[in-house]
Amino acid sequence: LPEIWGQVEKDLLEASNLLPEEWTGAEKGRITKGAAKALLARAYMQQHLWEKAKEQLYWLVEGEGKKYYGLVDNYKHNFSHLTENNIESVFEIQFSDALNGGESDDKGATNGHQRSIIFGLSGIGFRDGLARPWLVDEYKKERTIDGKLDPRLRVSLLYKDVATDFPDEETGKFYGKTWAEGKWGNDVYYRKYSRDDFRTTEDRHSQLNFRVIRYADVLLMYAECLNELGNTEDAYTYVNMVRARAQMRPLQEAYPEIGNDKQKFLSRLQTERALELNGECVRWFDIKRWELYNTPEGLAALIARDPDYKNFVVGVSHRQPLPSNEVANNPNICLLYTSDAADEAR
């Protein structure tokens, strides 16, 4: 594992030194210096190398790269094909529906992706990757400065009461159907990267670019690094920037009991990341970095929100069991597995 992390660091340091700070014109959307630095910061954070991660993120947040990034006014613009490669995009994978000639790597095959249909509502898509119901509850725990529900809720998730919760923004139909007509029951679906606002069905050729890293994520990562390094007071600034876009009160006002307590701040930051970044492929890495799977206390916090974690056993459920046929065919596999486990224990 140290060798792998070492190679990741080497590659991304080299990339950040060679890549341009920005691309323009037809080249816009290609990976940049800032993207390499943000990816490297992620790698450092997973290793708890907070000072190194902070150094990389500083370039984007307060350093020379700050001029290239910001938060878009409308949260939804991060998940629309009409507002791609915007100021909030740090690393964005480009997709297109121009070619729909199949799903392989052959010439003329699709340039789109399949997330929209795989995560789609039953009857519209495959209903894989359902969102967790506790997310809806978490969004509803706090109101905006105007007393309304968090606007990120209706952009992020589709659920039974979304039309009732947002009567001014919703028509009550999704892909041309009411919730009752769709027979979607109590399921909670990810709305991010869906196309319900301009289609009545989904296919395997979605043109929506996938935002691997948004500037909001960078700000929250920077806040986490500051907090871990003992600078909780300054960390508030960057969380509040993300909350302000959602019309939420500053963290100090909403949760004064946190103060400068490092653990209380981290606990709230964990929730802030879930509210801002759910469905964007960061949750598993977050939970692993916070080591919530490693202790009964961390696991209890997960179970309190999501009872499905009751099946998880600390020290046992971290990996899937080795297939019996692989063990039978390779007499060395158990030896290698035991050695790796011993290395991790040390």
Feature locations, PLM:
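Alpha-helix C-terminal capping/termination sites
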Residues: 46, 221, 228, 278-279
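Short edge-strand/loop segments of extracellular domains
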Residues: 61, 238-247
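C-terminal substrate/ligand-recognition segments
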Residues: 151, 155-240
